[in-house]
Amino acid sequence: MKRLPLRTLMRALAILLAAALVLLMPALVSRQTAPRLPHAENRTLLRVWVTSSVGGGQAWLKEQLKVWEKRNPGVMTYLRTVSPEEVYAENAVLPDVILYMPGDFTAPEEIFSPLSGELHAVEPLLRAGRWRNQQYGLPLCYGAWVLAIDSAIEPGNAATPAPTTLLGRPAATDPAQATEEPGFPLEAASRADIPLQAPAGCGLFTLSGLLTERPALPDDFATLTASEVYSGFLSRKYASALLTTGQLTALTSLTASGSGFPFRALVPREIITDQVWFASVVEGASEAAASLLSWLTSAESQRALTKQGLYGVRDDLRLYAAGPEAQVETAAGRALTAINAYIPLADAQAAAWQVFIGREELAGGLLPLL
């Protein structure tokens, strides 16, 4: 059989390729012109800085940022944790939104723009974000303080959390009827090596109201961090300890799963807290900043706070049904006092100590901090 010349074969292949391109051209054009989501370079970048957060707050925030981005495909967020000093650094390029705790900033007018419009938060929390009659901080969520008591010193009164639907907590139904709880077991606690421990700070306002009589206090009382106190109580080093509500939720979950131990919690009749997480908008921020803050205080977003044992800022939403969490929510509805976000931390801690040791009445100690 006679073989075709190489030149003839090349011509045939060229004709076939040309025909294939003609057939595929409509599909290629259609694929190139199909609508697509905005590329990163065409999306608005919203920068969010966090200088400090309430326990569990960052986990909630990251989850909510993902949801908000999906609902706003033209915007992407960049989350960064910084120190308050970095915000004031020379030549710092400030973000659009800053999230912080009380004491991080003492001159909000130098950094933040006043907020306006409808703000979905209860008045005691909004008031804590005001400075010189301007609303600089929007409260996003808050925690509180409770006194946890180990079952080892009073096995008859300890409460083992029952299995429930979410992290050892009841599902959100009608709040259970409150019952009278026994007070602090002074005699039983006094027999322990370390009867009571508490971290430094404004939790002492709460502790002073929970104790009518006090056991002997350790030398390092009110000098530790909240994390150190929680670790000590978890290892059963302390007979009782002042914990944040987020720590209480974590301990409840551990106990319900068999990793913790029975305990009970004393909840104050009124909530006094410095555990409020604020958000502020920086001057010149993107318009998307307002949309983000609205989402974070929406009912849908606030419901997710239960995963972290935190409390919502809205007056039209109840998150907990029973247990200490519900008692805290009820107490906050009765009376809620939040330390002003822009008071120096040292001033707030000193005032709380003066109230705890009895040198100042509660009202007098709180007044300069509001």
Predicted regions and their residues:
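Conserved N-terminal structural module of periplasmic/extracytoplasmic solute-binding proteins
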Residues: 1-102, 303-304, 364, 370
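Short glycine- and hydrophobic/aromatic-rich loop-to-beta-strand nucleating segment
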Residues: 145-149, 279-280
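Extracytoplasmic/periplasmic substrate-binding proteins
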Residues: 217-285
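Hinge/lid segment of periplasmic solute-binding proteins
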Residues: 101-146, 157, 177-188
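Extracytoplasmic/periplasmic solute-binding protein
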Residues: 136-140, 145, 158-215, 235-239
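C-terminal capping/gating helix-and-loop segments adjacent to ligand/active sites or protein-protein/ligand interfaces
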Residues: 306-370
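Short helices/loops that flank or line small-molecule/ion binding pockets
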Residues: 85-100, 105, 225-241
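Bilobed periplasmic-binding protein/Venus flytrap-like ligand-binding cleft at the lobe interface
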Residues: 277-313, 317
